[in-house]
Swiss-Prot record:
Free-text comment on the cofactor: Binds 2 heme b groups non-covalently with two histidine residues as axial ligands.
Cofactor(s) annotated in UniProt: heme b; heme c
Entry similarity comment: Belongs to the cytochrome b family. PetB subfamily.
Protein name: Cytochrome b6
Highest taxon of source: Eukaryota
Any one annotated GO CC term: chloroplast thylakoid membrane
Membrane topology designation: Multi-pass membrane protein
Function: Component of the cytochrome b6-f complex, which mediates electron transfer between photosystem II (PSII) and photosystem I (PSI), cyclic electron flow around PSI, and state transitions.
InterPro entries recorded: Cyt_b/b6_N, Cyt_B6_PetB, Cytb/b6-like_sf, Cytochrome_b_N_euk/bac, Di-haem_cyt_TM
Length: 215
C-alpha cells in the first residue's frame, strides 16, 4: 500500500496538498454561523445523489411523469426515502442559502476585496431558486402545473418582448410537453453544471482571500 502511495506522492505531491488544506489559518472569530455555506454545499451534493437515483425511474413525459413519481414512491426499493430526502434537502438548501446570505451581509463579508465572491454567491442564490421552480414542475401534478403556468406567465406583462419570452420558457403558447422537457433538462443537467462551475469559482476565491474579519 505504501508503494502505491509513494508512486502517487512522487508525481502529484499529495502530502503537500493535504498540508496546505489542513494548515489553513482559521480566524478566532469564526463560529457555527460560518458553516452555513458548507451546509448548503452538503445539501446540494445530497440533491445530486438522490436526483441521479430518481432519473432511473422518472419519465419526463406529460402522460407518464406523474405515474413514474407514484412508482418511485410506492414500488421502487427505497424510492419513497430517496424522494423524501430529495425534497427535504431541497428545502434545507434554500433555508441554509438564505441564512448564509444574511450572515455574509450582516458581517460585511461582501466588502472589498470580496465583491466578486459576493457576486458569485448571488448568482448561486438565483440558481438555487431556479432549481426550485424547475423541480416543482416535474411531478406533473396540479400544484406543479399551475405553479409553472403562473411563473412562466409573469414575463407576459413585459411590453413587446413579453409574449416571445413566455413562448421561449414554455416551448409553446401553453404549458405542455415542451415545457416539461425544457424544465427537466434545466433541472437535471444545465443548472447542476452551471452551479458546480460557480461553486468552484466561489470556493477558490474564498480559499485565496480567506474568511472575512469581524466587523
Amino acid at each position: 500500500m505504501s508503494k502505491v502511495y509513494d508512486w502517487f506522492e512522487e508525481r502529484l505531491e499529495i502530502q503537500a496538498i493535504a498540508d496546505d488544506i489542513t494548515s489553513k489559518y482559521v480566524p478566532p472569530h469564526v463560529n457555527i454561523f460560518y458553516c452555513l455555506g458548507g451546509i448548503t454545499l452538503t445539501c446540494f451534493l445530497v440533491q445530486v445523489a438522490t436526483g441521479f437515483a430518481m432519473t432511473f425511474y422518472y419519465r419526463p413525459t406529460v402522460t407518464e411523469a406523474f405515474a413514474s413519481v407514484q412508482y418511485i414512491m410506492t414500488e421502487a426499493n427505497f424510492g419513497w426515502l430517496i424522494r423524501s430526502v430529495h425534497r427535504w434537502s431541497a428545502s434545507m438548501m434554500v433555508l441554509m442559502m438564505i441564512l448564509h446570505v444574511f450572515r455574509v451581509y450582516l458581517t460585511g463579508g461582501f466588502k472589498k476585496p470580496r465583491e466578486l465572491t459576493w457576486v458569485t454567491g448571488v448568482v448561486l442564490a438565483v440558481l438555487t431558486a431556479s432549481f426550485g421552480v424547475t423541480g416543482y414542475s416535474l411531478p406533473r401534478d396540479q400544484i406543479g402545473y399551475w405553479a409553472v403556468k403562473i411563473v412562466t406567465g409573469v414575463p407576459d406583462a413585459i411590453p413587446v418582448i413579453g409574449s416571445p419570452l413566455v413562448e421561449l420558457l414554455r416551448g409553446s403558447a401553453s404549458v405542455g410537453q415542451s415545457t416539461l422537457t425544457r424544465f427537466y433538462s434545466l433541472h437535471t443537467f444545465v443548472l447542476p453544471l452551471v452551479s458546480a462551475v460557480f461553486m468552484l469559482i466561489h470556493f477558490l476565491m474564498i480559499r485565496k482571500q480567506g474568511i472575512s474579519g469581524p466587523l
